[in-house]
Amino acid sequence: MVSQNPNRQKVELNRTSLFWGLLLIFVLAILFSSYIFN
């Protein structure tokens, strides 16, 4: 599969990693707050 625009793949990869980073922070925040309030 030949990609004509490699920059587009890089942007999608950054967007995906940003999404997983935010999801990880969100889950850690939920676990941390539940740990504090218990």
Swiss-Prot record:
Name recorded for this polypeptide: Photosystem II reaction center protein L
Keyword annotations from UniProtKB, A to Z: Cyanelle, Membrane, Photosynthesis, Photosystem II, Plastid, Reaction center, Thylakoid, Transmembrane, Transmembrane helix
Summary of the function given for this chain in its UniProt record: One of the components of the core complex of photosystem II (PSII). PSII is a light-driven water:plastoquinone oxidoreductase that uses light energy to abstract electrons from H(2)O, generating O(2) and a proton gradient subsequently used for ATP formation. It consists of a core antenna complex that captures photons, and an electron transfer chain that converts photonic excitation into a charge separation. This subunit is found at the monomer-monomer interface and is required for correct PSII assembly and/or dimerization.
Subunit-level organization: PSII is composed of 1 copy each of membrane proteins PsbA, PsbB, PsbC, PsbD, PsbE, PsbF, PsbH, PsbI, PsbJ, PsbK, PsbL, PsbM, PsbT, PsbX, PsbY, PsbZ, Psb30/Ycf12, at least 3 peripheral proteins of the oxygen-evolving complex and a large number of cofactors. It forms dimeric complexes.
Bilayer topology: Single-pass membrane protein
TM spans (from-to): 17-37
Main location group: plastid
Underlying gene: psbL
GO cellular component term of the entry, any: cyanelle thylakoid membrane
Family assignment from sequence similarity: Belongs to the PsbL family.
Pfam families from the UniProt entry: PsbL (PF02419)
Keyword Membrane: yes
Subcellular location: Plastid, Cyanelle thylakoid membrane
GO biological process: photosynthesis
Domain of life according to the entry: Eukaryota
